[in-house]
Amino acid sequence: IGVRLVGSEMCIRDSIMSYIDYAKQSPDAEVLFGGNGDKSVGYFVEPTVIQTTDPMFKSMVEEIFGPVITIYVYDDAKYEETLELCDRTSPYGLTGSIFARDRYAIDKAFNTLRYSAGNFYINDKPTGAVIAQQPFGGSRASGTNDKAGGPLNLIRWTNPRCIKECLVPPTSYGYPFLGEK
C-alpha cells in the first residue's frame, strides 16, 4: 500500500524541490550531486549538493530544512571579505561551522562569525547541540537560541537581581586592610 502522504509532508517536499529546480535552471548554479525527488514514489528528496557562483543565491540566503547544501567557492585572496560576506548574507543562523588548520584563519573566522549562528563549531561537524547541555535553537531569524529543558532557557524567563543584607553594621567607614592609621 505504501506510505500515507500527509499534506504538510508533500508541501515540504515540494518546497525543497523548488530550490533544487531553481538551481537546475539557473545559469549561476549547478547541481553536483542528487537533485531528485520523484513525487510518484513518495516525498523522499535525495541529498543534494548545489554549487553556485553567486554568494547571494537563493539557496544560500534562505533556510530550506531539507537535505540540500549550497557551496560557494571563494577566492583565497579574499578570505576576510568572504567572512564578512558570510556574516551578512542571510538573516538566518541556526548552526554553522568552519574547518581550518591555520590559527590565523580560525581566529579571524571566529571573531567575524561569532554571532552568526546559535551553535558555532570549529573543526567539528554541525550536527546540533547536546540535549540539555548547551543552548540550541539558532540566532538571528532562526529560533530563540535556547530550548526547553536547558538552563539557559530558564534564565530566558527570569529577571535576575541581587539583594544584600548586612547583619553586622560597620563601626567605621575606613578599610583597615589598607593600612590606614
Language model regions located:
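Conserved C-terminal structural/oligomerization subdomain of aldehyde/semialdehyde dehydrogenase
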Residues: 37, 44-181
